[in-house]
Amino acid sequence: PIRLLLDGKIQSAVATDIRPGPLSRAKENAYAAGVQDLSCVLCDGLTGVSPDSVDTVVIAGMGGENIAAILRAAPWACRNALCILQPMSRPEELRAALPSLGLMIRAERLVRDAGRLYSILAVRAGAPEALSAGELYCGKYSLVSDDTLFSDILAEQDKRLDIAVRGLERSGRECDRERLNALRRAAANIAEMRRKYHGDGS
């Protein structure tokens, strides 16, 4: 938010964290940059944020399941705010949770940082578009604003699912059967997505 404030792209910002350390560093960075319109709130998720004080919520740097939990505890954000979400892991759990939160994906962007691929989702209240098993992992092609990395995310999630499927197959536990079947369906769907994306199945 400091860069956005300095560039005049936002008027004010609220930074939250459940730990004092990151908030203290945020205050120090804001002071060093000469930024005054950044409020730092020690709280869990959005619990310490006034619903009337923000119109855009950014949640980044954590797993998709944790982002979903934060939104579930802040229904006002789901109703009224534009939410920019960047899951560090388990994006499929976040995408799967959005319909129950009354949120629809407006757009997605893929970015690569330090060799890793990340999805950034812009979501807002609305009727969600149905996603296939594979799209829960990779995103829907028609929603991705820049498709240059879409082939890479398909390959990455395909490999991730292959490793997970092999692990569950080796375990042979009956309790893993439902999970294994779900992963197989997602893997098959991603394989089909790759064929459609490349056009020739390569």
Where are these regions (language model features)?
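Class I S-adenosyl-L-methionine
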Residues: S24-G34, R95, P99, D162, ...
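Short loop/edge segments at beta-strand edges and connector loops
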Residues: L42-D44, P87, A107
